Every structure is written in structure tokens, then in C-alpha cells.
Design a protein with these regions (language model features):
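Outer-membrane beta-barrel signature, preferentially recognizing the C-terminal barrel domain
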Residues: 236, 408-425, 563-564, 571-629, ...
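Outer membrane beta-barrel strand-and-loop segments of large Gram-negative receptors
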Residues: 460-472, 506-516, 599, 618-675, ...
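Periplasmic N-terminal accessory/gating domains of Gram-negative outer-membrane beta-barrel systems
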Residues: 91, 151, 175, 190, ...
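C-terminal beta-signal and adjacent terminal beta-strands/loops
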Residues: 629, 724-736, 754, 759-810
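Short, acidic, small-residue-rich periplasmic hinge/interaction motif at the N-terminus
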Residues: 23-27, 49, 94, 101-141, ...
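Short, acidic Ser/Thr/Gly-rich low-complexity loop/linker segments typical of extracellular
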Residues: 139-155, 159
């Protein structure tokens, strides 16, 4: 009987065992999902494991060889979470599997997640034109993002863990692109973007980060390419004062000669035209422009106030396209297309003034008496998506002529010439990139001596010729570190006019070698530091050599997603001085490299600011201080009569400081840009101790600019723009004579202000595109003499100036 009861008890235990195991499996979920309170803190992986075991009584089993137990991990934010969630956060960067062993044991299997390079190119879908500054974002299933921008060749690179990502690409004026990619090894992505309408639309200048873009990565003040004039938009940026077409602009209290213009990296000396309405370059051929001030990327040097990088189109690699433009100053044509489809393309543009053809129909006082033409040409060959070879040619000529011959025939009395040629090669091999270029640039200013000095004949000229070789390397280590270094060599020859009984030209050759190294370190997603140094050896063949060390520093911090704090420092040095004594640049003006005792001009620029990014815009406030050393000025009550410049010029120092604000906002069909700058620019000279610190010629205390546009229809818009600024300091009196010591830097021009209105119409007819622009400059206002010195006979009362432009692309 007793044995029967034992058998029955044994059978009941066997039947009940599966149920018991089922309860323990349920207990496994309970153990892994037990709640635990965690405070925000940092500890090693091993310390976190020990704390979990002590706090919960759970035994953790793991293979120490599979993970870095000494690696420091911070859990933030803290709070209530499950044990499983905490383990995944501790082992972020690992693929984690957790198995339960009763009664309270968790077996943790971890495998390090591999990371790979995701690289690619961003280009326009119809033309294969590479896009510089496109924002590329990779987003994983948890919403975590990795961001970068495409470089000057349209190439981008990101280092991300293996997995599936959504790739988002955005660029101003283009439809955003979204695609999915599975990353299991290094991969290459080609992104082709479609223009929203077509590329010859109105320009919007944005002073830094745009919606959903990278404040710490995007080039400062990037302007998208357009058929309009890019330079005419610079004046909307705070601290920038310029004429109608952006010529002769001043930046943060600096002079006209303190700004450098680069065309595809080639310096264009003394850019500009006789007509202040004519843009510096043919806008139909321009792809984009980047305007640097305050902080200068380490590879840049040569001027102390600003550097403007203008990049030309490479040409359509898929189909032949023609663009014809007729506006008030000039008529232009631009041709582009493939020579070898998807491989070799051409771009040729030419422009010429046309109102001068009607001079014979006008009275002598209303004639233009000048003509302008320029051309751009470019060949681009793609060996591969990341390897390109480009050839560039640029030329411009402005000619001012008068009927001086007895038979009434016109004689050229002033001519400006610019030339630039470049052969460049760029490639990318893994994380290492290289760009190498050879280029030649020249500027000549020629004048008829009979108009400069009585009883003389013939021509005199001044100029600069420059032959350069550059090579630039870049290296990216994951997403944390980016290095850039390079070497530049320049051989320059200056043609300088020597005045006296006879005018003659002397030649001064100069060798210059530059080396630079730049580091960008992203310490965290919120904090980045960029530090670099540029060294220059300036070696004239017949004069003293100079050596310069120019450090650069930029610190940026995002305290929140919508706010950016930044601190910038740049030391710059320029080895060229230029003083203009008339309304026009003449060969007899003071042009001098750092020879004959004229030391290089140097500057340190300090700036700190705050940017706030809104859903449909941004605002920015910054303060700056800039030093200026070895500045030159014409002595009071002085006329230049010969080549002894030391008798007429005095050397001093200066500084400038100010506060700047900028606002950009969109509301449905409305778009507003507003900028204001309060700045002071001072100079002091040892020869005038009694004057102390006086305003510089570039002191403009108050500068206010604004632009408001309204989208009337899908094809048309109306715009209203204006500026108000303090009058500039005078250096001549009302009779155009030099001021005395007592009046030196004491008088100003009146307050300048101007209101402009404009209308634009855009329409596509199949594959044909049309842009019409109409407007009036200075509807009301009091512009400066420089602004109205346009040499056009089409003026209304009060210096009101109409303009119009018609572009047709087919």
C-alpha cells in the first residue's frame, strides 16, 4: 500500500514538472524586466555589472573577452528602467543577446558592432553638376543621426555602425532626396538632386546654418548658384558695406584692398568694372559662392578682412544647354554640354556691354564712353566619381575711351585687363583626398599719359603677374577627426609705375611659399574645435624677406538643438598695399608689395556669437574686435608728384570693434532678411600725435539692411529692399583737394539710404526656361556718389535708376 502511494506521488511530480518549467520561463521575463532606479553617473562596464548584481541579486554571466570591461560608460539621463534596458545602454556599440538561467541568472552575449565608411557624391540630376555644401544625414531606426556636408567636389563621407539607414540629402533650391541603404561593408552612394524650379532663380543669402543643417560644418555664408548677381546680395550681411553690384566692399571696418577674390581658387586681382551695375562675373556661369569673414579656414591667406570663393559650373554632362541673358549693363550667352557623355563636359560663357553702341546718338555729356567684355571657359573630365581633371580660362577687359584725335576718333585712355588660367586635378582614395593645381593670374591697368600728365604721350601701365602651384591633402578619421594640410608656391612679378620727370615702369619679382595644417575635432555631437596654422615665407628678390605665422581657432558648442555658441580667432597678414587717389583705379595709384620699407599689414580678429535656429529661419548676434597694424594713409594737405612714396604716406595702426545682428524668417509666401551692425574703425599715426585715434576712411558706425519678398504666384514674386548707413569719412574737400591737418578725418558724407523695388517672373515651357526681372534702384533715398557713379544715361529724377533682365534657357 505504501509503495502505491509512493508511485502516485512520483507520477504527480512528473506531470507537474512541465508546469513548473513554464512558470520559471515566465520568471525569466520577470528577471530581465525587473525595474531598477538608476542615477545619472559614469562607471566602467565592470562596475556597472557589479552594481546590478548587488542591487538586484541577479547573477550576470559573460565572457570578458567579448567586451571592454574597463571602458567608461555614462548613463544619462537616469531614471527608472528595466535591467535589460540598462544592459543595452551599458553595452551600446555592441550587439547584445540576453538568456535567462533560473533561478536569477542572466547570460549576456555581446559582439562588437563593426563600423564602415559610407561615401558618395551629390550632383544635379539633369547635368551631373557637383553640388558643394549639400547636407547628408544618415538616420537609424532609433532616430540617431550622423551628418556631414559635401565638399567642393560634391563628395561626402560618414563612418557609421553596420545597420539599415535612411539617407536624407538637402540643398538650397533643390528637392530633398530620401533613400534607404543597408550598411554591411564600405559602400558608395550617388545622390542626384532635382532643382525645385530651375537654377536661374532669385538668390537668398543665408548667413550660416539653414533648417536641419549643420552649424559646425556648413561653410559660412554659402550662396547657391543663380543667374542673378551674387555680389549684389553681400550687402545684406551685417558688417558689409558695398556698392550696387558688390564692388569696392568693406568688411568689419576694413579697407577696399583687404578683400581677396578667388575664382575656382585662382586670385583675381582688382576685380570690378567701370559700371557699378555690372556684376563682377557672369552669373549664368557661376555655381556658388562662399564668403569668409571673421573666421578664415586655414588654407586661406593673403588679405585681412575677407576672402570670397567663387566657383564656376563644370558644364552639363548629359545634354547641350544654352542660356541667353539681356540686362541693363550687358548681354551674355552661356553654352554647356557633354563632349563625352557623363565623362567630359564644356562650359563657355561670354558677356559684353551694349549701351555704348548708342553713344553716337547721344550728346557728349550723356555718352558712356566705355565698354566691357569678359568670358569664362571650363573643361571638366571625370575619370571616376571621385577623380576629376579641370581646365579653366577667364578673361575680362574694361576700356574707357574719348574722342581725342583731330578726326574725332576714339582713343583708349584707361584699360583694365584680367586673365586667369588653371589646370586642376582632384581625387579621393579611401579616407585620403588630394587636390593639386597649377594656375596663372594677371592684372594690367593701362592709361594714356596725356590724360594724367600734360605734355606727355604714349601709355603707362601697372600690373601683377602670378604663377602658382598648390597641393592640398585631407584625411578623415571616422566622424571624430578631420585633418587638412598643404603647400603653395607663388612666383609674382609686380609692374610698378615710378613718377617723376618721366614715367617709367620697374619690375619687382617675389617668391612666396606657404604651408598649412588644420585639425577639426568633434569632441561630442555638441562640441567641436577647429585649430590650424598657416606659415608664409615672403621673399622678394631685391628686398628684405618676411616670415609669418598665422594661427586659426574656432570653438563651437550646441547647448541645445536650436542654439549654437561660437568663438572664433584668426590672424591674417597681407603683403600688398593699395591706395586709390581718384574715382577710378589708375596705374599711378599706390600699389606696393611689402618692399621699400613698407611692412606687411596684419590683423587679429576675435569674434564670439550666438545663433538660434527656428522652424523657418534663424537669428544671430555677435560681437567682434579686430586689430590692424601697418596701415597706410596719405599725409594731410599732400599732393603726390613723384615716386618718393615715403614723403607722402604715413604708417600707423588701427582697430575696429562692433556688434552685429541678423534675422532670416519665412512665413508662408513671405520672406524677410534683416541685418544691423554698429561698428567703429579707428586709426592712429605717430606723425599726428595731437589727433590721437581718428576714424578710419572705412568707419561706418551704423549699417542697416533689409529685404522683404512676397510670392505672388507660383511663377512670380515681388521684393522690397533697402539700406541705411552712416556717411563715410571724407579725405577730400568739396573742391576735391586734400584736407588740412585740422580737418583730417573730421568730415563725413551725409547719411546714405536707399529703397529698391523689384519684380521677377519665372516660367518653364517644357525643357525651356524663362526668367524676367524688373525693378527700380533708389525709389527714394540719398545714395552715395559711389553708388550713383554708374555711367548710364538712363537715369530718372533723384538718381532713380531702372533696371531689367531677361534670361532664356533652352
Amino acid at each position: 500500500m505504501k509503495s502505491k502511494w509512493l508511485l502516485l506521488l512520483l507520477w504527480m511530480c512528473m506531470v507537474a514538472r512541465p508546469e513548473a518549467w513554464g512558470q520559471e520561463v515566465k520568471s525569466a521575463n520577470t528577471v530581465a524586466e525587473e525595474w531598477i532606479q538608476v542615477n545619472s553617473s559614469s562607471a566602467t562596464v565592470l562596475q556597472w555589472f557589479e552594481w546590478i548584481e548587488k542591487s538586484t541579486g541577479i547573477v550576470l554571466s559573460y565572457n570578458p573577452a567579448q567586451m571592454e570591461l574597463g571602458e567608461l560608460r555614462r548613463i544619462e539621463p537616469g531614471g527608472k528602467m528595466t535591467v535589460e534596458e540598462l544592459l543595452h545602454r551599458i553595452l551600446s556599440g555592441y550587439q547584445v543577446k540576453i538568456a535567462f538561467v533560473p533561478p536569477r541568472k542572466l547570460v549576456v552575449h555581446a559582439r562588437k558592432i563593426e563600423s564602415y565608411d559610407v561615401s558618395g557624391t551629390v550632383s544635379e540630376v539633369d547635368s551631373e553638376e557637383r553640388l558643394y555644401g549639400a547636407v547628408v544625414t544618415l538616420e537609424d531606426k532609433d532616430g540617431k543621426q550622423w551628418n556631414t556636408i559635401s565638399n567642393g567636389k560634391g563628395i561626402f563621407r560618414l563612418h557609421v555602425p553596420e545597420g539599415t539607414y535612411t539617407v536624407k540629402t538637402s540643398y538650397m533650391g533643390y528637392t530633398p532626396q530620401v533613400q534607404s541603404v543597408r550598411v554591411t561593408r564600405d559602400c558608395f552612394i550617388r545622390t542626384r538632386m532635382k532643382p525645385l524650379l530651375f537654377e536661374i532663380e532669385e538668390i537668398t543669402v543665408e548667413s550660416g546654418k539653414r533648417e536641419n543643417e549643420l552649424g559646425e560644418l556648413t561653410p559660412s555664408n554659402l550662396l547657391a548658384f543663380s543667374g542673378g548677381d551674387l555680389f549684389s546680395q553681400i550687402w545684406i550681411l551685417p558688417g558689409v558695406t558695398s556698392s550696387l553690384a558688390g564692388q569696392n566692399f568693406m568688411v568689419d571696418g576694413g579697407g577696399y584692398d583687404e578683400n581677396l577674390l578667388l575664382l575656382d581658387g585662382v586670385p583675381v586681382f582688382h576685380p570690378g568694372h567701370f559700371s557699378s551695375l555690372l556684376p563682377v562675373f557672369n552669373g549664368d556661369a557661376v555655381k556658388n559662392m562662399v564668403f569668409h569673414k571673421g573666421f578664415f579656414p586655414t588654407p586661406l591667406e593673403g588679405r585681412i578682412s575677407s576672402v570670397t570663393e567663387v566657383n564656376l559650373k563644370e558644364g552639363n554632362k548629359k545634354e547641350h544647354v544654352r542660356t541667353l541673358t539681356l540686362d541693363m549693363p550687358a548681354a551674355s550667352v552661356m553654352l554647356e554640354g557633354p563632349i563625352i557623355k557623363n565623362k567630359l563636359s564644356y562650359m563657355v560663357g561670354a558677356r559684353r556691354s551694349w549701351l555704348d553702341f548708342f553713344d553716337s546718338l547721344l550728346s557728349e555729356e550723356n555718352r558712356l564712353n566705355h565698354s566691357t567684355y569678359d568670358y569664362n571657359a571650363k573643361l571638366s573630365y571625370n575619370f571616376s566619381p571621385v577623380t576629376t581633371l579641370n581646365f579653366l580660362a577667364y578673361g575680362a577687359r574694361d576700356d574707357y575711351h574719348l574722342p581725342l584725335q583731330e578726326n574725332g576718333e576714339n582713343v583708349s585712355v584707361l584699360r583694365w585687363d584680367n586673365q586667369a588660367y588653371q589646370l586642376s586635378f582632384a581625387t579621393q582614395k579611401g579616407r585620403l583626398g588630394n587636390s593639386t593645381a597649377v594656375f596663372y593670374s594677371a592684372h594690367t591697368n593701362r592709361a594714356y599719359m596725356g590724360e594724367i600728365k600734360e605734355d606727355t604721350d604714349g601709355y603707362v601701365h601697372s600690373g601683377i603677374k602670378s604663377l602658382n602651384v598648390t597641393t592640398d591633402f585631407s584625411y578623415s578619421l571616422e566622424n571624430l577627426y578631420h585633418a587638412r594640410w598643404g603647400v603653395k608656391y607663388a612666383y609674382e612679378v609686380y609692374d610698378l609705375v615710378s613718377q617723376g620727370e618721366e614715367m617709367r615702369v620697374r619690375y619687382e619679382p617675389v617668391n612666396q611659399v606657404s604651408v598649412y595644417y588644420d585639425n577639426l575635432l568633434r569632441i561630442s555631437p555638441e562640441f567641436s574645435v577647429q585649430v590650424g596654422v598657416h606659415g608664409v615665407a615672403y621673399c622678394p628678390q631685391h628686398h628684405r624677406s618676411y616670415y609669418s605665422i598665422q594661427p586659426r581657432l574656432s570653438v563651437k558648442y550646441f547647448p541645445s538643438e536650436r542654439n549654437l555658441l561660437y568663438l572664433n580667432f584668426s590672424k591674417m597678414e597681407q603683403f600688398y598695399h593699395f591706395l586709390r587717389f581718384d574715382s577710378f583705379s589708375l596705374p599711378t595709384d599706390f600699389r606696393m608689395p611689402s618692399i621699400d620699407g613698407f611692412k606687411p599689414r596684419s590683423s587679429e580678429h576675435y569674434e564670439m556669437g550666438w545663433k538660434h535656429f527656428m522652424n523657418s529661419g534663424q537669428c544671430e548676434v555677435s560681437v567682434y574686435y579686430k586689430t590692424r597694424r601697418n596701415v597706410l594713409a596719405l599725409r594731410p594737405d599732400t599732393w603726390v608728384e613723384d615716386e618718393g612714396w615715403q614723403k607722402y604716406l604715413m604708417v600707423g595702426n588701427g582697430d575696429s570693434y562692433g556688434v552685429k545682428g541678423y534675422l532670416y524668417q519665412r512665413w508662408k509666401r513671405w520672406s524677410l532678411q534683416l541685418s544691423y551692425a554698429y561698428s567703429r574703425s579707428r586709426e592712429w599715426f605717430g606723425e599726428l600725435p595731437e589727433k590721437g585715434k581718428v576714424p578710419s576712411l572705412y568707419d561706418v558706425p551704423h549699417q542697416l539692411g533689409g529685404a522683404l519678398s512676397y510670392q505672388l504666384t507660383a511663377h512670380s514674386s515681388f521684393s522690397l529692399g533697402g539700406m541705411l548707413r552712416s556717411g563715410k569719412v571724407r579725405f577730400l574737400n568739396e573742391d576735391y583737394e586734400p584736407l588740412s591737418v585740422e580737418e583730417f578725418r573730421e568730415k563725413r558724407e551725409p547719411l546714405n539710404y536707399r529703397v529698391d523695388v523689384g519684380y521677377s517672373y519665372r516660367k518653364s515651357f517644357g525643357d525651356k526656361l524663362l526668367l524676367l526681372r524688373l525693378g527700380v534702384y533708389n525709389v527714394v533715398g540719398n545714395p552715395s556718389e559711389e553708388d550713383i557713379l554708374s555711367f548710364y544715361s538712363v537715369h530718372w529724377s533723384g538718381n532713380c535708376l531702372p533696371y531689367g533682365s531677361l534670361s532664356f534657357k533652352f
